[in-house]
Amino acid sequence: MPKEKSKHRHRSRSRERRDHRSPDPRSSRNRDRDREREREKDRDHRDHRDKERDQRREREKDKSRDKKREHKSRRRRSSSSSSSPSSSTSSSVPGAPRSPLVKSPMKLLQTLEARRLVEQKDRQRKKEELKAHETPEEKRARRLREKQAKEQRRRERMGWDNEYQTYSNEDNPFGDSNLTSTFHWGKKLEVEGLSNLSTKTVEVLSLQKQLENRRELEKVKKRRQERELERQVREDDLMMQQRAKEAVQFREWQRQEDQFHLEQARLRSEIRIRDGRAKPIDLLAQYVAAGNEPLEECLEMQMHEPYVLLNGLPVEELEDLLVDIKVYEELEQGKHIDFWNDMITIVQDELQRQQKLEAENSSLNQRRDGIHQAVVKDVADIFRGKNAQQLEEMRHRIEAKISGRADGVDISYWESLLSQLKAHMARARLRDRHQALLREKLSLLKRENDNETLQEKVAPQVKEEEMETQDAEDPEVEEGSPEDEEDPLNELRKTVRLYQAGNYSPRYIREEDFTGRRAQNEDVDEPEAEGLLYEEEDDERRTQRQRLLILHPERVDNNQLTPQELRMRNEAKQGMQGDEAEFSVETTLDAVPQLATDKYRPRKPRYFNRVHTGFEWNKYNQTHYDMDNPPPKIVQGYKFNIFYPDLMDKSQTPQYFLTPCADNGDFAVLRFHTGPPYEDIAFKIVNREWEFSYKRGFRCQFHNNIFQLWFHFKRYRYRR
């Protein structure tokens, strides 16, 4: 047998040498395929030989084990027969060991080993029986299963993943017929100096490389997961920051909304007070805001305590007042909280008192009250005349008596007394606050009176000093020339000065005005026309105009900017460059009728516009002009900033409309339109095509009550 194997190996090696010398690639592929088949055969033969060797060794072990077992059983039988006469002697020795206890573990192991061998023989016997009785198809299926299991174990040793376990040479997505065999890269092995290695060594190196690549892939996968986790953490942090920012913004919106509702409630109160249909809550709100207002606006209201307004109110109005007070308390968010809490206590007490009276009148109240009607007046006398501090001490004593619950104490009486005491304490606090407010207003009134008295005393002295200064500056008057003495105007001038110094004479009227001649210039200012006499028709028209200004002072045209409009104008001025100038070419529009429901007077909005000018260096200007003698500037764009601080509907965005002029096509009218109370406003601009790109400076937005429309004109360049 060994000689045959050596001959076979010699033939295969000689065949490999011949195949190695042949330069044909097809023959080399066939040679590799034959070599692979021979390796498979050698491997199968080696496995079969190892299997037979193992079976032979197993049989020899079984035989030797059976011999040992038989030998032990014979010795046991002989020892048992010889131990019967010597049992008495062995039992008499106290230190002799007991054989059954010592040999019991050995017996157990032997029994288990014997049972295992029996089961193994049974399995082997059944397997042999199945092989003997199986059909050729079953035999092929069994060998195929064994081959697949063997291939599975080999792939596991090679480190294949579960993803590639189902691939085979015939069925794989790569189209590789040698997928299961190790790839032999001869050129690479030659470069690396590993061409002399055996196939098994190459397989081991390939397996190590594969395991190293797998570990590297695991590291890459782990790093990718860590990056994804870090990115998720960053996104969560950004989301939390965004949520916090939105929460702050929402709280700001909520605060602005509450402030808006509070301003609207105050505005409604002012309108009702001005129209003579004020509610109790309007007067209370006016009383609370009186501390920050001028003296003359709320002096009449402040002469009485605020709870005096509750006298004579029915139950329905008291309930409405209680709801309104709670609304104001919620809108003001802690401002004047003590005042509103005291008013709630007083209103609730008054409401309970009136409800009790109604129930007694209708005979529906059958429950005994804590205080008898006979002593109600005495209880009121106890509370009357005490300040807030004394009432607070009384409250502590009553609460201590109620919490003590001593024998003989009427708890219901003291509880009713405590409920009334709270209302009296609220009235006392409001009374003290009212007295402090009156003292403050009184001191302010005294200071104003002192200032007025001082001004009245100083005014005549100032006028006399001015007259003396004028006389000193007039040299002609000091010289006293006869021409000046004869001048009637000089005497008249002195008379006027004396009248002004006396501060009681009427204004001088010219003699020609006594005829009742009307002023020919109707556009004369009010101070200049004050000394004129009017006819009855003109006087009536002037009186009506003054009455209208008194009833509606908001309709007076005031060119002075408010602080808010001044702040908006300064904001619009920011970023103004040297090539920009202020632009205010406003055009007239047809009168647009306003709605009857407008709450504010119609008026035009304020604005701050800029015009952007510059040089256009076209071919003609480059030829005829230079930087020392530049061409005339042209309009290159506009920046309109229209202010709408009092816009009623902030959701209605202002709009603009561009209409070319009918008489001149080079100009157009840019009209801005929005809701009440603002009227439309229009400007006359150059009619050219706009640049609507934000990169070119276009802006159309309504932000911070400012409507901004910024644009530049397109520049056309000549191209051949």
Curated annotation (Swiss-Prot):
Residues 109-159, 206-236, 346-375 form a coiled coil. The keyword Plastid does not apply. Expressed in ovary (at protein level). It is found in: Nucleus; Cytoplasm. Residues 1-15, 68-78 have a biased composition (Basic residues). One of its GO terms (molecular function) is lncRNA binding. GO terms for cellular component: catalytic step 2 spliceosome; cytoplasm; spliceosomal complex. Residues 1-156, 449-492, 512-541 are annotated as: Disordered. It comes from the Eukaryota. Its main location: nucleus. Residues 79-92 have a biased composition (Low complexity). GO terms for biological process: cellular response to virus; dorsal/ventral axis specification; mRNA cis splicing, via spliceosome; mRNA splicing, via spliceosome; positive regulation of antimicrobial humoral response; positive regulation of Toll signaling pathway. The keyword Calcium does not apply. Residues 16-67, 113-156, 512-521 have a biased composition (Basic and acidic residues). Signal peptide: none annotated. Keywords: Coiled coil, Cytoplasm, Developmental protein, Nucleus, Phosphoprotein. Residues 465-489, 522-539 have a biased composition (Acidic residues). The modification Phosphoserine is found at residues 99, 104. Interacts with cact. Belongs to the CACTIN family. Plays a role in pre-mRNA splicing by facilitating excision of a subset of introns. Plays a role during early embryonic development. Involved in the dorsal-ventral embryonic patterning. Probably acts as a negative regulator of the NF-kappa-B (Rel) signaling pathway. PANTHER family: POLYGLUTAMINE BINDING PROTEIN 1/MARVEL MEMBRANE-ASSOCIATING DOMAIN CONTAINING 3 (PTHR21737), SPLICING FACTOR CACTIN (PTHR21737:SF4). This is Splicing factor Cactin. The lineage of its organism: Eukaryota, Metazoa, Ecdysozoa, Arthropoda, Hexapoda. The gene is cactin.
